């Protein structure tokens, strides 16, 4: 259970986890599930009205805009104060997609994509690590994507940010190998969430896949929640959690096929 015996006081202390991107979908469902598992959950959202809604759901709301370095600093300071400098877990889940052919995406759009999906997560994690490393235990879980394993036309910006997150997580895992902190990646394929509401499509963007085909392999947020729960509660969390048949297929095909063959499968 997410409780431990205090070494000096004998008190049983509840473990605290920060979850980002809690306004809906994977973040919200995971936050509620981790609460049911016995964790104290700090639920970070970008909008003040969503933070207020977290309070109504029995969660501790935190205002956090990963695109704003000062907001990240304020949120990290609030988390450290609320946890008395003792944080058990961090679920870096927030993010959004900039979709469209690369020749339609400006430098500013690309920077915003990386700011929200990568730089913000890096800054937040580094600010919170001092509240985790002294205690000899902890979990850092990252929401990546099948697009962190394979790129496709029209999704280059999003895929690039997730590829970066994959490499960063691998490096962090090895750097923390003696700390007791475990690092895991969640790699969802098509999931029914409000994520598509946060997609910033360029004006010449066109659908890059047949939605009818994708729909057949789409799962609900609960498929991801199950993996998140395992990553935070298992004695032996996995390094990577592929979610949906699409992700499992991509992992297998990348091992078996040359790059040009993969291009044909993706692009036709």
Protein language model features and the residues they cover:
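Active-site loop immediately N-terminal to the catalytic Tyr-X3-Lys motif
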Residues: 103, 150-156
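SDR active-site lid
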Residues: 178-238
């Amino acid at each position: 259970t997410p409780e431990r015996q205090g070494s000096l006081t004998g008190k049983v202390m509840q473990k605290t986890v920060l979850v980002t991107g809690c306004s809906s979908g994977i973040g919200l469902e995971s936050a509620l599930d981790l609460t049911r598992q016995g964790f104290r959950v700090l639920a970070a959202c970008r909008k003040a009205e969503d933070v207020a809604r977290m309070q109504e759901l029995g969660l501790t709301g935190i205002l956090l805009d990963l695109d704003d370095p000062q907001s990240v600093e304020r949120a990290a300071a609030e988390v450290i104060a609320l946890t008395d400098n003792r944080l058990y877990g961090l679920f870096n889940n927030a993010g959004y997609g900039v979709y469209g052919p690369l020749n339609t995406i400006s430098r500013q759009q690309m920077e915003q994509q990386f700011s929200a999906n990568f730089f913000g997560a890096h800054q937040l994690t580094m600010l919170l690590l001092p509240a985790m490393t002294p205690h000899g235990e902890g979990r850092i879980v990252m929401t990546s994507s099948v697009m962190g394993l394979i790129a496709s036309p029209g999704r280059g910006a999003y895929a690039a940010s997730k590829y970066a997150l994959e490499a960063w997580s691998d490096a962090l895992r090895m750097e923390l190998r003696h700390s007791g902190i475990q690092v895991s990646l969640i790699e969802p394929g098509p999931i029914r969430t409000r994520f598509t509401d946060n997609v910033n499509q360029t004006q010449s963007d066109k659908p890059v896949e047949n939605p009818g085909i994708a729909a057949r392999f789409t799962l609900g947020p609960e498929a991801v929640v199950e993996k998140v729960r395992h990553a935070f509660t298992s004695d032996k969390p996995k390094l990577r959690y592929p979610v949906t048949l699409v992700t499992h297929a991509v992992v297998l095909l990348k091992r078996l096929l040359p790059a040009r063959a993969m291009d044909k499968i993706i692009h036709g």
